[in-house]
């Protein structure tokens, strides 16, 4: 039996129809068939620390209030039950005493979502003011990785189920204990999927981030090919072991400066102290031994400062986490040693999106920085962005323009190292086709560790 398709559905997993990145009808399908049924990262837990603290999350015209109650964290659809006006003014605040007050007619709700006041109550029919019906509509929430996630679908599998084994790895990383140092945001003139796919493979490093490939060509050439077409730097077999170690530290320094949060300066400082350590003569064993020492010393240094740094060597063996982990449909974590960068991408239209990035790390208890409540918004070409995302941002708008080229009907992917792009795109198709939720959840689990990975059989 042949499955009935829909326009722009992927038929060849190595070829992605380009109109999926700008077609208005396909964008409408995503808005209607995908986004109402997926887990969306709404805020960080530290943004609502005290009872009554609230923050608004919005996406595709839907607004949700996340609020700290006496019993935990709740979320409500941000609309007055009278005539639909949003209840919040501003993006965040505290309503412990007054609750949520509609700016239109003054109706009021407490932080548990219960209506506490209706002006001119006697003028309304009794059934209009039924207590249960008048309560704010709750929105489903789960807390993972130090973040509050929301889902508009009460029947969707749990976020924990969707994450699968990745949840265990992130737990071991103590991701829930990390705090944001800063957050930047920008609006990119590109489809949200174009913006995300720039971070789903490392194959672009040689050309887009040449400073990284030039520093440790052995790392990138071994993964993507020795012949760099005269653009990248070839491997130099004559470099001494110490020179190679210095290159690794310098590479970390470039990541620290270029990605800020991904490779933290405190970890680079530890690595620098290990440049002159005694190592095995075999180069491959020496590099592995050196990285093991870096893991150990970063762990020890963090714990000595009172930070909840995990045992990085044990983590690498028992619950490994890739350098880029994609959490469907629009959130990334990029762990490196003790810290992480995080990305969230939200659609603003068929060819526009909001891109936010955070620097996350551990702090000793009581020494956490001030809570970051809003991103610092910058133009996408601002030199205030770290170098590496700035280099990526320079390509993204160009790619969006190129997708409209006459005769360019599909993107052609490597089935070996660009599989993550194909895999998550076909999961979007699964939502549009209304595949069973258990199959979608099982397919989504396969995205864990799929960075630079192959095209997979998703089971539908």
What is the meaning of each model-derived region?
Residues 9, 19-60:
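Glycine/alanine-rich phosphate-binding loops at beta-alpha junctions
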Residues 27-42, 114-124, 317-320, 326:
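Short, basic/low-complexity N-terminal boundary segments at the transition from targeting/disordered tails
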Residues 47-154, 158-172:
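Rieske [2Fe-2S] iron-sulfur-binding domain
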